[in-house]
């Protein structure tokens, strides 16, 4: 599917991988990496981060691979590294999340900053105190976009940063 020119084939490939994600194993990560880097755009990459996340959640020994991806030259690998724990809720590895986000602070790239914000926002539904503390500790290095997205569900805390966001 990823060799075909039309985007619809990549969508079909992502849908298929999502359907079989529980069958995938660490040995599939190199091929997934190739898919992430093939005709990359947010719509397919964001589907693949769930597939990668499923593998990492079942095989924690793969976490170092995501740390490697978090510093890659390829923004799409970095985006998957940042967002692969979306939906993990209380199973989120905060040490890994923090390290991956810290590897991507002070970025100008929209897709990286948006991913950081989404990752923080998603986890704030489970642990708003952790997200508040993280944003407070790194507010000078996070983009306004990341802060705005990440603080969306943390209540009045968000008001503290509105002056910087506007």
Feature names for model-found ranges:
Residues 1-166:
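Alpha-helical scaffold domains
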């Amino acid at each position: 599917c990823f060799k075909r020119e039309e985007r619809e084939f990549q969508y079909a490939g992502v849908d298929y991988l999502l359907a079989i994600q529980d069958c995938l194993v660490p040995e599939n990560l190199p091929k997934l990496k190739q898919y992430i880097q093939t005709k990359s755009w947010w719509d397919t990459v964001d589907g693949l981060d769930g597939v990668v996340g499923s593998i990492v959640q079942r095989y924690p020994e793969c976490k170092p691979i995501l740390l490697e991806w978090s510093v890659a030259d390829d923004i799409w690998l970095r985006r998957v590294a940042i967002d692969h724990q979306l939906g993990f809720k209380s199973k989120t590895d905060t040490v890994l999340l923090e390290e991956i986000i810290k590897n991507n602070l002070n970025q100008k790239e929209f897709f990286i900053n948006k991913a950081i914000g989404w990752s923080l926002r998603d986890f704030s539904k489970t642990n708003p105190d952790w997200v508040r503390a993280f944003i407070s500790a790194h507010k000078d290095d996070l983009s306004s976009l990341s802060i705005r997205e990440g603080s969306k569900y943390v209540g009045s805390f968000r008001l503290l940063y509105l002056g910087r966001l506007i």
